[in-house]
Amino acid sequence: MKKISLLLASLCALFLVACSNQKQADGKLNIVTTFYPVYEFTKQVAGDTANVELLIGAGTEPHEYEPSAKAVTKIQDADTFVYENENMETWVPKLLDTLDKKKVKTIKATGDMLLLPGGEEEEGDHDHGEEGHHHEFDPHVWLSPVRAIKLVEHIRDSLSADYPDKKETFEKNAAAYIEKLQALDKAYVEGLSQAKQKSFVTQHAAFNYLALDYGLKQVAISGLSPDAEPSAARLAELTEYVKKNKIAYIYSEENASQALANTLSKEAGVKTDVLNPLESLTEEDTKAGENYISIMEKNLKALKQTTDQEGPAIEPEKAEDTKTVQNGYFEDAAVKDRTLSDYAGNWQSVYPFLEDGTFDQVFDYKAKLTGKMTQAEYKAYYTKGYQTDVTKINITDNTMEFVQGGQSKKYTYKYVGKKILTYKKGNRGVRFLFEATDADAGQFKYVQFSDHNIAPVKAEHFHIFFGGTSQEALFEEMDNWPTYYPDNLSGQEIAQEMLAH
């Protein structure tokens, strides 16, 4: 028995050595990817240069996945690990802390792409105090063909930088696949640009980027599962909602059970269909030769069942309350005095990031979300708003230091009151007023802060107004509002934070 055990151990060792030698002999990279879109895009770019492995199979939610010890070892033994975004694979940041960065290269497929807040977002003009706060970001960018192209491009560029000897192959493979994605994008543009109904109702709120890029509106509903019938109370609510908005289809992420489809059809007069979020492919899909492009073509066909039918704009079941303090709606009695300590810290102007193009994605999002201005018009608007030559402001409990043209000027300040201003849209904002006690403060004699808050709280960013004439003169300034964020944030981090408002 002992001899048999030794023999088996020897054979296993020989097998492992053989596998290792084979890996070296074929010269291929070993790339581990997280879930299906990342796997597909990486495989298309790498081609025959790599063995690309999928970590998360069908039936497992990438958000909730926790890598086993075996999976961690697999990643640690890889040449490259590719994931989409930490907002999707929430377990990745912890994993990255354990990886040997010299041995395993990592690629974040979204790169410098900015993400939208995970919840609904109200957009509007920059009448200070109108924006809400969200801190979770939507990672489902792969469901928009035009953004899928950006993911492929970033994977291509990252692999090329890490393995320059294979750059030509990566570029050739990526170009061929991007051509197919461009054709898919064209099909979406042609299929949806003349949509008669621009709203679609889905049980899985994963299609925000698709809707945004192709002129549609995603309306998400809750309490509906493809596997089970809704409760009588929920069915009554759905029936009323469907009839009120004349909804023809409700989409789920997989085929609804026949019982659910029959119930919704009979009671609510609405049909069900699939919008596949493409987080995985089933074994049946794979055997049938399905892939990212073919599934996205099916999604387009499903969407057109709604968009080709005329109907009124579909409103969310529960309208979001936009008349909040953050959006500039409050009672006068709620406004409280604040001290300079609320703004204490080291701050940087955002104007340089606007000038170098870091905020261009922000303006593109705003243009698509609001439809009020083009990207170029938004950039011009914020250029005027952010413009300043004061690059940094360092604040203590009673002093402000302004860095201007490489020179520093520091003064002591006292709080002198607050002023409620009413904007054209009807919402309001509060400016908190400070005055320098130094006679030589010049253009920094009078200072006003606006940061979307109306009572004592630590500011996360602020707009500032300063001048040497009077506080009253500053009240008239509505077009130029130099804006500052903590100086330890990168331009990319600030841009992402802006989208969270």
Task: Please name every model-derived segment.
Residues 329-332, 337, 348-399, 437-455:
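Short, solvent-exposed loop/hinge segments that bridge or flank secondary-structure elements
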Residues 425-426, 453-474, 478:
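His-enriched metal-coordination microenvironments in redox/metal-binding proteins
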Residues 412-458:
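An exposed acidic His-Trp-rich patch
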Residues 1-8:
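Positively charged n-region of N-terminal signal peptides that target proteins for export
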Residues 200, 383-428:
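Mid-length scaffold segments of soluble, non-membrane domains
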Residues 5, 19-334, 341-349, 436-443, ...:
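Extracytoplasmic metal-acquisition and chelation regions
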